Every structure is written in structure tokens, then in C-alpha cells.
């Protein structure tokens, strides 16, 4: 899996508290190993966000992304609280 990082993801990641940054990095390690792990709650988004997917990091924290070629390439679009990231 090749990870790409959108500017919005990088900007949002920088604003996270240290504990949440660690949780995001741990989740991404797990995601790279097994993108469909049930614990990640990997799911397609609907409505205005159709074509995008999201995984759960911890509690309210989500990562929104797109994937191509069966997860060969993943672009991380945003990270943050549920209500904020679903307003892309």
C-alpha cells in the first residue's frame, strides 16, 4: 500500500494533541497491514462524500481517505472529530 497525504490531512494532523497523533500513527500502521480489519470500522461514505471511505481511530477521531486498485494507493484526505471531517 502506498500512502499519499493531502494538505488538509497534514494540516489537521499538526493540530492534534500528542496523544491523538500517536493514536493516528498506530492506526495507520494497522491500516497498512490490514485495511479491512473489523476494528478499524472501515466503511464507505454516502451523500456528498460518496467515493470516500473512513476509518475509526479512537472514540470520535476519524480518518477520511480514498483508495484505488484494491488499496494499492490510498490518499489520506482529513483527520479529526466525526462532525468536522464529515463536512469535507
What are these regions (language model features)?
Residues 2, 7-11, 15, 22, ...:
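Enriched for short, Lys/Arg-rich terminal
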Residues 16, 28, 45, 76-77:
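Generic leucine side-chain signal with a strong bias for well-ordered alpha-helical environments
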Residues 17-18, 33:
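A generic secondary-structure boundary signal that marks alpha-helix termini
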Residues 30-55:
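A short, surface-exposed loop/turn module that caps and links secondary-structure elements
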Amino acid at each position: 500500500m502506498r500512502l499519499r497525504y493531502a494538505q488538509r490531512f497534514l494540516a489537521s494532523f499538526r493540530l492534534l494533541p500528542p496523544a491523538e497523533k500517536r493514536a493516528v500513527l498506530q492506526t495507520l500502521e494497522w491500516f497498512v497491514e490490514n485495511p479491512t480489519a473489523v476494528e478499524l470500522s472501515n466503511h464507505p461514505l454516502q451523500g456528498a462524500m460518496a467515493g470516500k471511505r473512513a476509518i475509526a481511530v479512537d472514540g470520535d477521531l476519524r480518518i477520511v481517505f480514498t483508495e484505488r486498485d484494491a488499496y494499492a494507493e490510498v490518499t489520506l484526505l482529513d483527520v479529526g472529530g466525526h462532525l468536522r471531517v464529515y463536512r469535507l
